């Protein structure tokens, strides 16, 4: 029986726009941004800020060095928020319904302070609630110090929340993340970015 629902943010709860993120960082002056950004797991300074190896300020300073001019926190935030295409209302409605039905909702996301400076405010859903209002717990890579698909990230959730993988469903759009979760015994679902997944999830839970 499924008791716990563990969701990814980008590509699941939030529809992402990789091309817009690339465009914005190019606009900021990062000429080789295509080799620095990935839809699932970042590398270099972009990976370091998502893994918590550098702070938001250190990221800002390094990106300023890369582009040859001083960038502000808001400049960096502007770039990262290029990923945010929309948070579909159907997804928010599904989260509310599932929480109301007694499921324990947990977020497990590779993310960074710039993205969270938006998501942890009421701007997340258009003015009524922040990301925190929809979940029992948030596991954010830059706070935990590890990124998916590393098994340590999943193990942190298992240990801290005292959950059993076989009683948990992990929903993520990244195939490598899904594979890592399966190896630990999680039930999984892998919708594509922007897919209308709530109905399929409800049907899966009803079985």
Regions found by a protein language model. Give the residues of each.
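Asp-based, Mg2+/Mn2+-dependent phosphohydrolase catalytic module
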Residues: 1-3, 7, 112-113, 118-207
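Anion (oxyanion) recognition and catalysis
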Residues: 99-100, 182
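A structural alpha-helix within SAM-dependent methyltransferase catalytic domains
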Residues: 96-99, 158
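Short amphipathic alpha-helical segments and helix-helix/interface helices
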Residues: 22, 92-96, 107, 154, ...
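N-terminal helical cap/lid subdomain that shapes the substrate entry/recognition surface
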Residues: 2-93, 100-101, 112-116
């Amino acid at each position: 029986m499924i008791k716990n629902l563990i969701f990814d943010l980008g590509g699941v709860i939030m529809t992402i726009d990789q091309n817009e993120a690339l465009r914005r960082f190019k606009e900021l002056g990062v000429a080789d941004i295509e080799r620095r950004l990935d839809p699932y797991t970042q590398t270099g300074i972009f990976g370091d800020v998502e893994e918590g190896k550098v702070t938001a300020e250190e990221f800002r300073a390094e990106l300023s060095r890369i582009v040859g001019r001083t960038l502000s926190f808001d400049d960096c935030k502007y770039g990262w928020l290029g990923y945010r295409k929309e948070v579909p209302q159907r997804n928010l409605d599904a989260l509310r319904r599932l929480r109301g039905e007694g499921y324990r909702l947990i977020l497990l996301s590779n993310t960074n302070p710039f993205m969270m400076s938006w998501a942890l405010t009421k701007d997340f859903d258009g003015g009524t609630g922040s990301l925190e209002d929809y979940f029992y717990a948030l596991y954010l890579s830059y706070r935990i110090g590890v990124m998916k698909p590393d098994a340590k990230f999943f193990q942190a959730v298992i240990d801290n929340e005292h959950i059993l993988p076989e009683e948990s469903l992990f929903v993520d759009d990244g195939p490598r993340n899904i594979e890592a979760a399966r190896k630990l015994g999680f039930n999984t679902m892998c919708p594509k970015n922007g897919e209308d997944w709530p109905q399929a999830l409800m049907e899966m839970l009803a079985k």
